[in-house]
Amino acid sequence: MLSSHCLKKHNHFHCMRLGPRPAIAQDIARLGSAGFVTEVANGVVIFCFNAILLRLAGDVGVAAYGVTSNIGLVVAALFSGLSQGMQPLLSRERGRRHDENVAQLLRTGLFTCLGLAGVMYLGLFAGTDAVVAIFNSEGSAQLAALAKPGVRLYFLYLFAGGTNMVLSAYYSAVGQAGRGFGIALLRGLVLIVPMAFVLSHFFGITGLWLSLAVTDTAVLALTLLTRRSSRR
């Protein structure tokens, strides 16, 4: 279907020979760095969580994390879709210097994010037994005992974590890629890994489940503090 458009004589798209443009490639890499860090960090975090759970609870602990991580993929996709949907709109309004529209889009994105987080967390909290049962076909009581509190504690991160994802996308879209990269790096790698080891050392599996929520809350607090200080 697309080729038929290109073959028509009355179109404005033509093949052109273009050489490499390092400046453009650099801009693309800079603006996409936050997303890159997020994707790479996911693998590192999963590895660390599995290693800690294997030490604390054996194979059953790893299976319990499998429940939360699989649900987390769906949840992250929703926040990622929201963030990616905002970015072109934010960039357009920023380019037009419509600062009021940029602020309105950010507010709408944040309210939508918190609404999604609230609905998803309430759904997971109320339906924990049913959700865990989907992944516990053998009816293991040990797996259920680990996974049920895991779901309820792990997904407390939705509120601060979703907000961080929206803010990271916002900064990348309005030309402040450094801040967006900083949020992604802190929440995805720099803080979460040591936080997981420290909290699991002192509070066991409960500390591990809470490590993501604690990390995202700390990153959000730091982001809001730096945002406020930059306005002064």
Feature locations, PLM:
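Hydrophobic transmembrane alpha-helices of secondary-active solute transporters
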Residues: 34-42, 50, 76, 80, ...
